[in-house]
Regions:
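N-terminal helical hairpins
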Residues: 32-62, 79
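Conserved tyrosine-mediated DNA breakage-rejoining catalytic core shared by Y-recombinases
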Residues: 16, 162, 217-293, 297-301
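N-terminal core-binding DNA-recognition domain of tyrosine site-specific recombinases/integrases
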Residues: 32, 58-61, 73-147, 319-325, ...
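Catalytic-site neighborhood detector that most strongly recognizes the C-terminal catalytic loop/helix
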Residues: 236, 369-395
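A short, basic/aromatic helix-end/turn motif that makes direct DNA contacts
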Residues: 32, 216-223, 366-372, 380-382
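Short, Arg/Lys-rich segments that mark the N-terminal edge of DNA/RNA- and chromatin-recognition modules
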Residues: 1-33, 229, 234, 241
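Basic, Lys/Arg- and aromatic-enriched nucleic-acid-binding interface segment
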Residues: 128, 132, 136-137, 148, ...
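Short, basic (Lys/Arg/His-rich) helix/loop patches that form interaction surfaces
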Residues: 124, 189-194, 207, 256, ...
Length: 401
């Protein structure tokens, strides 16, 4: 490329240099309006360096890990990952990765530094899942530095190992809690059909949905009563104070069979919702899904250009209910019902375990729960219950005899 040049034009200074030829013709690049020659040289030097680096504002061999993480976040995370994942990664970068690695050059970061950090997180008492997820964030960033960006030759995270981290008995009990029939019956007795939490609870129990997926069901478009199916194609998620329909985690859109008992619950809800529309008239709040996934609500007498939907959970007057409200339900179960192990995800664990202990094939359970692989299903969502152990003994006895 040509050398940087400066010249005075009137009362101001301009920098210029020759860019790559286009169709065999010269491609001069310039910018003016600087008060002094020194200002023009400084700005021109920066512009030429950025041009020579194909628009990058840094030299890959010199960039710090801190600046690279910012670059990766702006150019990959914001473009390709969901809002909630963006927020999660932003926090992991700010709280964990920059303090640990930000001062190093990207090109000099090696596995031993990463391994010391992992071991340090264990000593500080972080859970295995926290260590694993934070390392995954770093590995994802460095993986893109290898390919497609080719800033470094290999990913040093590939050779790091997470040591054995023993889960406390309390944490293990919470994670592996299965909501047995007696516990669920007590919950439904407290939050019966007239409660706003009845349908989300029954949806988690009958369909094994994530909490956001349960609240993301549209009764107008996602339920097929003729085929006895429900399609899980959205999760209701909060982005900057607004609610959106977004694809499920891992894009795990799926259509699953539902029981007559659950169908009856949904039919009753649709019937009651229509009755309330007539009862409230113009004061009923209708719900719409906009083109960008935004969930928008307006009085029924206001015409909105958007897809009208019927959220599975709403107040009597149609106002949207969200996963945030479920915190109250969990609090009541903990304190009033004396069940501190309950959490919204346990209904998903319960669903998978009930299927497995009654003979459902692992692949069927995996697809019903919307997992990306069977290992996740069997390791984290299907627990070895006493019934399974007893069944195994019966099978063994039959085989031996």
């Amino acid at each position: 490329m040509g050398q940087l040049r400066t010249r005075k034009r009137g009362s101001t200074w301009e920098w210029s240099f020759e860019g790559a030829k286009i169709n065999g013709k010269r491609n001069p690049i310039s910018h003016g309006g600087y008060r002094t020659k020194a200002e023009a040289i400084t700005a021109g030097t920066q512009a030429k360096a950025e041009y020579d680096s194909a628009g990058r504002r840094f030299t890959p061999s010199d960039i710090s890990v801190s600046d690279y993480l910012d670059y990766w976040y702006d150019n990959y995370v914001k473009t390709n990952l969901s809002y909630n994942t963006q927020k999660d990664y932003e926090k992991k970068i700010r709280v964990h990765l920059k303090p640990a690695f930000g001062k190093y050059r990207l090109a000099s970061l090696e596995t031993d530094i990463i391994q010391k950090w992992i071991d340090g997180m264990k000593r500080q008492g972080y859970s295995r899942s926290m260590v694993k997820n934070t390392l995954s964030c770093l590995s994802g960033a460095l993986g893109y530095a290898v390919y497609p960006w080719k800033y470094i030759k290999y990913n040093p995270c590939d050779y790091a190992r997470i040591p054995k981290i023993v889960m406390s008995d309390e944490a293990k009990a919470h994670t592996e809690y299965i909501c047995v029939k007696e516990d669920f019956a007590a919950i439904i007795e407290r939050f019966g059909p007239d409660s706003n939490f009845y349908i989300p609870l029954m949806t988690g129990y009958h369909c094994g949905t994530r909490l956001g997926e349960a609240y993301g069901i549209d009764l107008l478009h996602d339920v097929d009563f003729e085929r006895h199916t429900i399609t899980i194609q959205h999760q209701l998620t909060n982005e900057g104070g607004k609610w959106y329909y977004r694809p499920p985690k891992y894009d795990s859109v799926r259509t699953i069979k539902i029981l007559p008992e659950y169908e009856k619950i949904l039919k009753t809800e649709i019937h009651n919702r229509k009755k309330n529309m007539l009862r409230y008239g113009q004061y009923f709040t209708k719900t719409y899904q906009m083109d960008d996934g935004l969930i928008f609500q307006a009085p029924s007498n206001v015409k909105i250009v958007g897809k009208e939907i019927m959220p599975i959970s709403a107040k009597e007057n149609g106002e949207l209910l969200t996963p945030y409200s479920f915190k109250y339900c969990a609090k009541v179960i903990h304190e009033e019902l004396g069940n501190p192990l309950f959490h919204s995800h346990c209904l998903r664990h319960t669903h998978g375990t009930l299927l497995a202990e009654n003979g459902a094939q692992p692949k069927t359970v995996m697809e019903r729960l919307g997992h990306k692989d069977i290992k996740t299903t069997m390791d984290r969502y299907v627990f070895n219950t006493e019934k399974m152990q007893n069944d195994a003994i019966v099978i063994l006895a039959d085989a031996i005899s």
